[in-house]
Amino acid sequence: MTQRSCSRRHFLAGFAGGLLLPALARAADDAAKAPVEADPAVVERVQRADAIRFPRESFQTEIVVRNYSNGVEGDARTFRVLSRGNDNTIVLTLEPATERGQALLMRGRDLWVFMPSVSQPVRLSLAQRLTGQVANGDLARANFAGDYTPALAGKETIDGTPALVLDLAAVDRGVTYARVRYWIAEADNRPLKAEFYALSGRLLKVARYEDFRELAGRVRPTRLVMEDALKQGEVSVLTYENMNVRDLPERMFTREYLRRLQ
């Protein structure tokens, strides 16, 4: 075999390898990005837990958020939440009086804040802090079934209640948390506890669903305790009041409509 033919073979082999390796890398990357098929039975349980936390119909509720530091109560805020389905929400600030008139508008996963002193709405992320341990998405979007792919991770007992432990993986980076560890009652899907994680895998906060009472036609948690996992003693307590199912027209959930409220 001549030196020229050997060189040509080496060139062709290198050229083919240069084409093949990127193609294989792309295929592996596409496989990694492919959505994981969730067990329909597990998805249904998350949907039922969502429906226990909030009505599936349009509704209105008021939420009082009290922030604590090492057991000492700090500031408190009151919000009115109007929600139409899973994708349209308005969060109005009622108290303190100095912030009255501020409003959050969520459509899908797009979120804007409206402030009386600013002429144009400002785009926000669901993960940004609203107050204390509460992120914007904790009030504006609570659709675990739509935002996360669930998987059964095991079973545990929470305060004497047999519970399923679910791992919820974010469907994309636009949701509030990258991952949620979620405990729901095995018997009736009541939400019991949740751990919220950052994209890095760091535990951000721990939440407990408490004080189940009848609200808007069924028994729901009326108290949510959120503890900072990074800074001990920092706690926010959310109390849900005056929850009512009501008709909310879609025209309410627009930037133009909220501008008229300013």
Residue map of PLM features:
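Boundary at the C-terminal end of the N-terminal hydrophobic targeting segment
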Residues: A25-A27
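N-terminal low-complexity, Pro/Thr/Ser-rich intrinsically disordered segments
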Residues: K33-A41
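N-terminal mature ectodomain segment of secretory-pathway/periplasmic proteins
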Residues: V42-S117
